[in-house]
Every structure is written in structure tokens, then in C-alpha cells.
Amino acid sequence: MTHASLHGSYRRGTDRRLFLLAATALVLLALALADLATGPSGMPLDDIFKALRAGPFYDKSRSEVASRALALLPAAPAGLESLWQGMGEFFGDEARLRKLVTILWGLRMPQTLTGILVGFCLGLAGLQMQTILANPLASPFTLGFSAAAGFGAALAIMFGGMMPGVAGHAWYGFIIVPAAAFAMTIGACGLIYLIAVLRSATPAILVLGGIAVLFFFQSLQSLLQFLATPEASQQIVFWLFGNLLKASWTSVAVGLATLVLCLPFIIRDTWALTTLRLGDANAMSLGIHVDRLRRRSFIIVSLLTAAAVSFIGTIGFVGLIAPHMARSLVGEDHRFALPLAAVTGAVILIGASVIGKILSPGGAIPVGIITAVAGVPMLFGIILRSGQRSAA
């Protein structure tokens, strides 16, 4: 093949990958609008756009000024009847718009944005973990990070229930419980990282360490549920479901800050991670320090996972399925696989949120349940496809 034909083939492949990435992003945008529109009180698209244009800091003083002006009008002169009626309609529209702004920006927007950011984090973390461990079944969920977060949250809920008047405060559920889950996730990752430093950071060492962490924290979690009061046990179970109803603007800020912190390192290691898919020997022959790359990627995965699960609870299968879907579409090139895995993770999570709201309009089914139910057949498909490749 000539240089021109090779360059043309490369450009066609790149254009195809960019098209798939753009198409997936459009699907995510459509699902995000659907997620904003669904809920106990339906919201048509034109109302959504009205509330979006009004913004989160909608100026309520305009209606207050207008109401004072209305109070100064004469009782009901014949010439002002139409004006009176028009201002009454104006106030009705103002009140309705304030309600729309409250629902959209105060309740639904934080949940949708948190779902997108959590999907980004889990998709990126899952692809990096499968790459550094050379294991198609590796994910933040299967290696115990989510179990560690669940134990941290259960610990905070249980001890909060022992302190009268503390657990009932809103700040406890929005700050202390997520902080405990975040800290425990980082602690679990630190334990596995320490094992990798003391030994070599081989995939086998990291996988065995992750499995040990998974069973350890699951057993501690079960012990806490056994010892907890019925009220605390119910709160623990609700947290473990994985629910976007727990999202807030705080979870949006933490998720966004974590992504901004980790993305420069992820982008820098893109070529190294792509090369690592060829095997350790090939990567080392090209000058890549494999152990250092694995340890650095493991730290990034721990931060992404901690930010993802600390606020909304355990979300299974997203970090496992999204990387496989991304690689099946764009291949092993991490320049395209990483962003597509992130967007695909968000598509799965927001899609699960929409399905949960449609199936149970009064109270949305937790997304953790939807992703688990949908993830099982996908996992079987991955296993069967891997078996066919091995046989071939």
C-alpha cells in the first residue's frame, strides 16, 4: 500500500470514530433532556427551555415590584379592566415560572448532572482498570471499591444514629456520610496500592488484593447491618441501592472537581495505556515504566471511583460494561476509547434513571437496581464473546 492509501485509510478510521463519539454524545443529550422531563410532575420540553433560560438565580424581585404597582391601581376603573386582567395573567405566569425553576434547577438538574458525571467517572475508571490489569472483568465494583464506600457510609449512618439529633440534620446526610464513604474508598485503594508497592504491581497482585478488599468490606458491612437499629439498617440499605435522589449541587461540584483533577493525567497516559494493551513486554521495550504506570493509573481510578459512589451509593456494572461497549465501537486506541467509555457510562446511567422514573413515576426505582438488572445479560454476552475469541 502507498503512503497516500495508508493515510486515507487512517483518516477514514479516525472520522468514523469521531462520528461514533459525536453520535453517542447526542444520545446522551437526548437522554438528559428526557431525564429532566420525567418525574412525579411531568415537564414538557418548552417548559424545560423556559426554566433553562430563566437560570438558577431567577430574579424574583420583578414580581414583587409588579405586585406593589398592582396594589396602587384604583379598585376597578372600567378603562383598566383589561390591564388588570393582563397583570393577573402575568403574575400567574411568573408564579408558574418560579415553580418550574425550583423543580428544574433545585431538584432535577443536580440529579441529571450528577448522573452524567458519575457515568463519566465510572466509564473512565473501568477502562483504565481493565487496561492496567489486562482483565476484561475488572471494574471498580468487582474489585471492592464500592464495598469499601458502602462500609464507610454504613459506619457513618450507624454512629450517627447513636447520637440523638445529629443524624436528622441535612448536613449529616449530605456531607458526613459521603465524606466517610469517600475516605473509606481511598483507604481501600491505598491498601491495595501498598501491597503493589511492597510487591510488584502485576495484574495478579492487584486483582487478588482487590478481591480480598471486596470480601473484607462486604463482611464488615454485613456485620454493621446486623448490629444496627432497624432505622439505621433501613438507611444503610437505601444508601447501598445507588440512587440519584441523593444527588445535590455538592455532588456535582465534587464530581466535576475530581474529573478536572484527573483528566490531565489521563490524557497524558493515553498513548502509554494504548501500548500496554499490547502486553507488558512490548510496552517496556518502548520505554514505558509499566509498574509506575499501573500505580499512577490505580490512584486515578481510586479518586474517580470515590467521587462517583460516595454521594449516590453503589452503582454496579457501569464501570464493567461501558469500556467493553467503547472498545467494540472504536477499538483499543485510548484516544477514542477513553472519551467514548466516559460518554457511554453516562448514557447507561442516565438511561437507567429515565427507565426508573417511567416504571415508577411516584418514586423512581434506584438506578443501581436498573443497572444491575440490565448489566447481567450484557455480562453474559461479554463472557460468551470472550469464549468465542479464545476458541478462535
Question: Can you say where each PLM-predicted feature lies in the sequence?
Answer:
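Alpha-helical transmembrane segments in inner-membrane proteins
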Residues: 2-392
